[in-house]
């Protein structure tokens, strides 16, 4: 008697359990450049050299106003010193697109730039309008460097527990040689 009632209650409860499925994920690739140590110093020196000769961009993307950026002033896709790294990044983007079975014609149009962050420099959350895929490559950083945060593109006015990855912000440590690839 009691055992049958418990089974019946359990079955009824199990039949009514809510199933939550996750759709429209944000796919973020996270990989490390296998030759980062070979190019790191040369590219860091090159970036600092550029920062001394090319004025920082006046573009007003949101930051504290101190951030040095070559956005719109120096396209590193056209800079020969970045060629090896750019080619590796293009290969990684192709893998990302192929893995996600995206039907997109990769022309690698657009631009690439670098930012030099000092203590207290930051950027606000932003989108890359007009782009399909974006990348972030960390040339230099340390354990005190800021993390990169991603938040859902879906407007949500309900605060969630940040320990619940599908609903909270997601972040990545900035580590030398790390490449993040994501939908713009």
Regions found by a protein language model. Name each.
Residues 13, 17-102:
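Non-heme Fe(II)/2-oxoglutarate
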């Amino acid at each position: 008697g009691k055992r049958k009632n418990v089974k019946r209650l359990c079955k009824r409860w199990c039949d009514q359990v809510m199933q939550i499925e996750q759709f429209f994920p944000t796919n973020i690739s996270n990989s490390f450049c296998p030759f980062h140590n070979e190019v790191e110093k040369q590219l860091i020196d090159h970036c600092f050299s550029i920062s001394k000769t090319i004025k920082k961009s006046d573009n007003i993307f949101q930051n504290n106003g101190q951030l040095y950026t070559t956005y719109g002033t120096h396209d590193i896709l056209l800079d020969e010193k970045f060629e090896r790294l750019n080619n590796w990044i293009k290969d990684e983007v192709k893998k990302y697109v192929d893995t996600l079975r995206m039907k997109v014609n990769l022309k690698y149009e657009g631009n690439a730039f670098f930012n030099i962050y000092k203590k207290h420099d930051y950027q606000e959350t932003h989108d890359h309008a007009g782009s399909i895929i974006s990348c972030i490559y960390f040339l230099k950083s340390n354990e005190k460097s800021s993390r990169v945060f991603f938040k859902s593109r879906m407007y949500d006015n309900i605060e969630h527990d940040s320990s619940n990855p599908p609903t909270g912000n997601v972040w990545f440590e900035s580590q030398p040689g790390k490449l993040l690839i994501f939908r713009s």
